Structures are given as C-alpha cells and as structure tokens.
C-alpha cells in the first residue's frame, strides 16, 4: 500500500499553488502586454487613417478647384468591376482591415486621377491674350463663345502635354490650324491649336510635360499663339481653372 505523509501533502499543495500563482502572474503580464499592443495598434491605425484621409482631402480639393467632381471621377476609376464571394460575418478586426483597405484604395484612385488631370500650362512662359468664355471675335468683330484660352509666346516655343495620355488626333482642322488632341482618361481631353510644328502622331503615348509641338500661327489667327482647350466628357472647360488648381500641386507659372 502507498502512503503519503500529511506534511508532504501540504508541501506538494503549496508547490502547486506557487506554480499556479506564477502562471497567473505570467498570464497577467502577457495580458497587459497584449492590451498595450492592442492600444498601440489602434493608435497606429488611427494616425494612419487620419493621414490617409487628409491626403485624400487635399487631392479632392485640387480636383474640385479644377471644376470637377472627385466622387464622380473615383467612380469612373473603379468602373463596373464584377463583384461576389462568400458571406463572412464582420468582426472589429475585419472592419478595421476593410476601413484601411478602402481608404487606401480611394487615395490611390485620387492620386491616379490627379496625375491624369491637366493641371499645368502647356508652355513655361506666356501671356494670355484671350480668356475662356464670351468674347469679341478678333477677326470678324462679332461676339461668340471662346472654348479655350489663347497663350502668346514666340514662334517655335516648345508646347508640352499638360498630363500623360494618348494622342487621339493630329493635323489640320478648321479654325484650329495644325493641332494635337490628347486623351488623358477619365473623360478628359486637351487640344493644342495653331501649331507651327507637330511632333507626335495619332496613337502615340505622351508623358507629362513631354514636347508635342511648337507654337505657331497656323489656321484662323491674327498672330502666333497657342489656342489651348480642356474638355471633360466632350464639354469644354475653363483651362485657367485647371492651371490655378494645379498651383497647389505643381510650381506653375
């Protein structure tokens, strides 16, 4: 028969209690560390989301100042993306993950949009001889709508693309003379008229501020200048608004 002395039982019990207390102490410390990590994580996520939101607001402000609707453009950037998948109940962790993902996705979309908007002037040094809107025609003296702005500089001054895109038209056109048209995506196009020389062909890709031609006096003009247009969804926009809005992003003239 196996016997255990009473004092040995007490010793064994005290040992187990001590081990249990040690384990509880370690568990408590681990819990404190976990709580601290969770707070640090929450703080980091909060700071990150605030920074992302501020950057998005800055870009939205620039787009709005150009006369465009940032929400409309963001929707265009997403397109008709197919959707589906299994239903997974939402948790706090998953909610945070989705919030971060959505904020980042929107910021990325806004950045791509701003890169595609013509926010600079097509030449470095110029003066404006005709603004956008109603004006007296310089040739026949009758009032009509001017769908762009006229930028005066010396003949053969370099003309640059005001945003990256693809050349959709080149050559001679009535009233424009020698012209270049660029599609920047999102429904945005720019036109450059009265050129002396065209350096690009239809279908070519162009980068931001890449030379596309030289200033001239071709077409219906009274002297050398660039007729510059911005279109959104085929409707003429005021190019000056885009250039002024771009001063928040670029060091414009």
Where are these regions (language model features)?
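Non-catalytic extracellular/periplasmic "stalk"
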Residues: 1-127, 131
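Catalytic cores of peptidoglycan-degrading enzymes
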Residues: 115-253
